[in-house]
Amino acid sequence: MPKAEVILWQYLKGKKINGCKFRRQFGVGPYVVDFYCAEFKLAVELDGDSHFSEDAQKHDIERQEYIEQFGIKFLRFTNKDVYTNVNGVMQTIYEAIV
C-alpha cells in the first residue's frame, strides 16, 4: 500500500468518522477503489503521480463514471493532499457523510 494510503487509513479505520466503516481496496465491478464506506456509498481514491498523464486521466474519468452509476459518491485526492493537509482531506470526507 502506498505511503499516502497508509496515512489516510490510520485516520479512516475503526469507524472514526461518524461511525462509518471504511474498507480498503474494495471492488466495484471490474474496478477497485482505495477506500469504501458501504453505509454512505462513498468511495475515496488517492491519486499518485501516475494518474496525471492524459491517458491515465481518461481512464480515471471512465472508471469514476462507471462507479457513480451505482449511486456511489466519489471523492478524489492526491497523495500530496494527504501529505500536506490530511485534516482538510478528513474534513471533506466527513462533510460527504453527514
Predicted features along the sequence, with ranges:
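Nucleic-acid endo/exonuclease domains
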Residues: 1-98
